Amino acid sequence: MENKRICVISPSLQMGGIERQLTILSAYFVKRGHDVHFIACRAGKHFYELDSRVHFVEPPFVHTAKASSKLFSYVKTISFIRKQIKRINPDTIMVFGDIINPIALIANKGLGYPIYIADQISPKQNLGRFKNFMKRITYRSATGIIAQSKMAADYKYEVFGSDINVRIIPNTMRDIVDCPNAEKHPWVVSLGRLSYEKGIDRLIDAFSRISGHDDWRLVLIGDGPQRNQLEEQVKKLKISDRVDFLGSRNDVDALLAQGSIFVLPSRCEGFPNALCEAMASPLPCITFDSVSASDIIDNHINGEIVRDGDIEGLSSAILSLMDDETKRTLLAVNAYKIRERLEKNKIGDMFLDFILEKM
């Protein structure tokens, strides 16, 4: 493949799933010999480090949270992106983010560069009238749309029309730190932000219904706005002595390696990175069918899928794995294969094949 100039547009380089994905993909693109230009739409402290060969630019202005200034910020961002696109003169553009996608599409209007966009949220997530309106009036102008799952692709066809160019490409996986000597504990582990959409309250409810297994603990990795509320829920259910809130941690892989079961109880997910990381650990995993799980889990083969909102079903699935070490081992062995499926070179090539399809 002839080397091309690729423009990558990201919300920022701050901590976030989009930023992590684009950092990984940008590094892979330059590894393949392409000239990569990375535009961050929001200036600020950088959580991720780009490959030194990636050209980077961010706006000289800082966004404000005031509602009265949001429209002005949008206009400034559109102008900034348009100016950078003209300067870079890319062969193709790739944008991630439900807020940034419409802005980038407007900025590219009249310039005619191929532009590929990707949402990173669940199709079930309501963004509000304004954002939904912006998506409806701009998305059809994209050269191509990247969907993380079949559920997301079907939704895009339904909303934007059956004639749009959609490709299903899952997220790539970060490098997992192997911990072969980790001591296993009777832990039911969950990883994620402590917020409503992550559904930790549902997991706590399900765990509280399990009796006769007092040696098992519920270990929650992550922090967020619902932490106090969840801690109160644990107290009311009288299971405080069996639940650990670990907060945000830098040793996630080591903690996963010590666990015995992983549960992702989310109400909605764009692409369940935490689930994939747990499978790669490897751990036997349980999730609701609300997170495009069927794209990742073959039910009863490499994980367990429970009907969304079925708390009793989730509790039963957890109990079944607690009582069956052989089943846990079998699911974990099969789950480990997710590493090969989401290997970054393989996923990186899928992105390149799509965003360079018109070359």
Residue ranges and their predicted role:
Residues 8-16, 20, 24, 28-72, ...:
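N-terminal strand-loop element at the rim of the active site
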Residues 19-24, 186, 190-209, 214, ...:
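A conserved mid-protein helix/loop that constitutes part of the nucleotide-sugar donor-binding site
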Residues 95-101, 119:
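Short His-centered aromatic/hydrophobic patch
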Residues 140-166, 173-175:
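A short, active-site helix/loop in glycosyltransferases that binds the activated sugar's phosphate group
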Residues 242, 313, 320, 327-341, ...:
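A short, well-ordered alpha-helix in the C-terminal region of glycosyltransferases
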Residues 248, 267:
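Aromatic "clamp/platform" in nucleotide-sugar-dependent glycosyltransferases that forms part
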Residues 284-287, 297:
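Short hydrophobic beta-strand element within catalytic cores of glycosyltransferases
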Residues 299-300, 304-311, 320-325:
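Conserved acidic donor-binding segment of nucleotide-sugar-dependent glycosyltransferases
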